[in-house]
Amino acid sequence: MLQASKQWQWISCAKKNRLLLDLNEDMQLCTPYKLRQLTDSTFKNPYFSLEDAAFYEQVYQYLVQFKLWNPAQLCQISLNATAVKFQLKPVLAKSWFFEQYTGSTPSTEAVINLTSKAQSGEFLIVEHSSDASVCINLSENFQLDDNLSLVQFEAIRVLNNRVHPLLNQHIHSKIA
């Protein structure tokens, strides 16, 4: 696991129109988040905070138990989740893209499935409220409909009745 450092900084890159995380002299993480999506605090306080570090490590440790991703992927997922949690403005719910979950088993995990008309894919819940959840796309590309798609780690808010707890069965079949 890449250990969080007080030297890490969030960078608002106008050239790429993206939020970057400067990890050291040789390494930067380029997120899919555009500058217009960022909170004002991103521009005022660019340092990776203790709160950022704690959340990053919590997500990493949670995801490692699934045994689906290598350490580099775990870092990338965890850092993008941290960016969404602390650096992004609130996103509006876009539940109409997803099928409603009609099963009786509630989701108890933060790694979930969402199903659009075009496909089904894995997402990570970054923030959860009683009505809706902010999720990041874990697939390389997720097709919402014929015209729109989400790139990897792009955030979307969905009503909780769209959350499918199918990954538990999927994970156990991959591990077995």
From Swiss-Prot:
Q: Name one Pfam family in it.
A: ZapC_N
Q: Name its GO BP terms in alphabetical order.
A: division septum assembly; FtsZ-dependent cytokinesis
Annotated TM spans: none
Location in or out of the cell: Cytoplasm
Q: Name one GO cellular component term.
A: cytoplasm
Q: Carries keyword Cell division?
A: yes
InterPro entries cross-referenced by the UniProt entry: ZapC, ZapC_C, ZapC_N
Keyword set, alphabetical order: Cell cycle, Cell division, Cytoplasm, Septation
Family in the record = Belongs to the ZapC family.
Q: How does it assemble?
A: Interacts directly with FtsZ.
Quote the function comment for this protein.
Contributes to the efficiency of the cell division process by stabilizing the polymeric form of the cell division protein FtsZ. Acts by promoting interactions between FtsZ protofilaments and suppressing the GTPase activity of FtsZ.
Write the protein's name: Cell division protein ZapC
Q: Which organism is it from?
A: Pseudoalteromonas translucida (strain TAC 125)
